[in-house]
Every structure is written in structure tokens, then in C-alpha cells.
Amino acid sequence: METNTYCLSEIAEICDSKRIPLSAMERVKRQGRYRYYGAQGVIDYVDYYLFDGEYLLIAEDGENLKSLKQNIAQVVSGRFWVNNHAHIIQTNSKCRLRYLYYLINSMDISGYITGSAQPKLSQANMKKIELELPDILTQDKILSVLCTVDKK
């Protein structure tokens, strides 16, 4: 299978500048129906959303970046809010979003993580992650198998 090597920044739009963290106190005042995401998933529900669509969230910090007890990337869709502990990604025409999800969760990215007490995947380091990508048609074929297996 022929692949091309890209840095993540070449195949994705990073939407981190749209993140707005809310303190626990602020979230209590703003309870609602929209999911509020942190590094590892939904941590609350709030009354408004910042994003509407399908995105890939990649954990920015936390122990799980080293222990990998859970996936560090997750696909989210619909209307939601994200705090400043998860990177927000949309892919371009070179890469399917769900393909990147599987790829990131199966890669060793330890070389891009800094911090010993509090592991962190900075935006600058995340943009440098090297990815081997096949063409879109091949990605679609691989995804059809992976998604079928995941549904079982």
C-alpha cells in the first residue's frame, strides 16, 4: 500500500482558538442540554454550544496521555462545547476524520508529550505528529472494515 507522510498540521484545521473553558461554578449556573467536553469526554452539560458538526477531540493534558487507559482521541458530532483540555480538529480532503481517529489512537505519540508531573500534548507538538496516510479511497476501504468491527 502506497502512503504519503504528512504532519498533522498539513491534513487538519486546528480549532483550539474557539475553545472557552467554564469553571465548575459557571457550569452550575449554565446547566443545559449541550455536552461539555474535557480531555477525556463529557464532563457536564451546558445551556449553549460552541461547535456544531463532526470533529475529532484529542486530549491535551492528563495522566491518560501516558497510561493510555482510554483512547486519547474521540469523534464527536452535533452541538457541543469544549474546554481548553482537548484539541479540536477537522480534517481536510487528504484524510477522513474517522481514519485520523483510529490512527491517533493506535500510534505511539509519547515523543510529542512533555511534562512529567502533568503530561501535556501542546498544540505545537501535536501539529508536528507525523502520519502515514494512504489515498482517500484506501482510507475508505480500511474504515469500512474498522467501523464494522467497532459496531460488533
Predicted features and spans:
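A short beta-sheet element
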Residues: 38-105, 114-117, 122-126
